[in-house]
């Protein structure tokens, strides 16, 4: 905020009139065409709302802002001015009709552009709070409104500090009642619509479930969570779940909630967003555990329930230590067959469609390739992997690769797999879910390596293939150390720093970089770069040390700042003394 504040509030700062007016206009407009003098805003806090009809996030945020505006405008001096980013007047008009506040006329593009530049608007929705003198009060209005609503008025740094201090006090003094009870509500609801007093939940272990029914990860957790909840009830444990739905559609909330066995806050309860802040919600689904005393026992046990089910209860530190030991034992006992055999599913597919028994792969180094045709980085990486696979196979190594698809249909799977020379898990195979969980696949492409015993060697094999190609085989820590020693030997006589005409601002320092793009030849490089960390600038050793006076002028490179780089011979990514 400091830079924008300095520009807006500095010595050359404008008052509200000059901020919102133009030489030909001293008014703003309402959506019915009424003109409102800018000077009538004196004494009010103003929100400048940069938004546009074509922007989906804007369309979703505007109703929230309308609610806050309606609550504040009738009680305190607060006004909003819409600064449109629409591309035509019709779109502006249609969108503006949803807003109860003022706007800079669409025809005054000069003022709209000036405000964009003054407040450094680089994305929308953007809500900037100013006072009646035009001075910047808060440039994060969207985040403030989403988090605190009207409670944040007058949006000043002092008010934001006060809110933060109140939140800290609430966390320190947390009880079940402070979490779930509001001045207007002392109950939660059951799926049949009955009110359940919060007092009936006191003394129990409580799970607060933050969820959105339409979100895939929430949907995937639900069956396991229902099973977990049902088993605890059968065991007569003092445990309850309270759903805090972040749905914005009441029908979706009702359709989802009526099929669940647990309790919930009423739809659109304003304490939902407050609780999301209170527990510093960062992901969905989140299941916060409160102990019988109402204090937070664990910030999110969703993954623990997904992995261990009822074994994770009651989520104490001692229980998690037990689970850690179980996981360690599971990892140590891992074999290829424990990963890939599930009931009758004891095979993978060969290129001819034949079933290849998992038992026939035991004792080999295996790469597990999580990928999909719809994923551009996957399509870019696969040809490189095909090349490396063939090179390793030509050496008659005990090696194989298995494709684990995230494609969306059989046709896409077949088309993508036709480009691959290796094995595959059948499309839609249920083993994919357990493999993705075991290797914690958060994104694709991902390449995990298993050693001959079936133990995981690395989950970062993709980086090793990109950096070292077939030389990375068998992808072990020992092999990586051998490669690094080789490159250290190659680079031991290279200058540690150079100056180059393509980057005269700073010296370039010899740096170990896994993968980069050379800023001279624009080709990929690995391992060693002449690098400027401040500017994120990289040169291959050959590009930094090879003289090319025709391209770069005389004395293109000075080693150590003074000495010529004569005497170096560079081939590929390697430079050696002549």
UniProtKB/Swiss-Prot annotation:
UniProt keyword list: NAD, Oxidoreductase, Repeat
Per the record, what are the reactions this protein catalyses?
[protein]-dithiol + NAD(+) = [protein]-disulfide + NADH + H(+); [protein]-dithiol + NADP(+) = [protein]-disulfide + NADPH + H(+)
Kindly list the GO molecular function terms attached to this UniProt entry: thioredoxin-disulfide reductase (NADPH) activity
Return the EC number: 1.8.1.8
Domain of life of the source: Eukaryota
Q: What is the documented disruption phenotype for this protein?
A: Disruption of pollen tube growth in the pistil and reduction in the ability to target ovules.
Query: One GO BP annotation here?
Result: pollen tube guidance
For this record, an example GO cellular component is: nucleus
Keyword Repeat, does the record have it?
Answer: yes
UniProt domain Thioredoxin: residue ranges: 18-172, 178-321, 325-485
Electron transport as UniProt keyword: no
Q: Cross-referenced Pfam families, in alphabetical order?
A: C1_2, Thioredoxin_8
Give the UniProt family note.
Belongs to the nucleoredoxin family.
Mind telling me what this protein is named? Probable nucleoredoxin 1
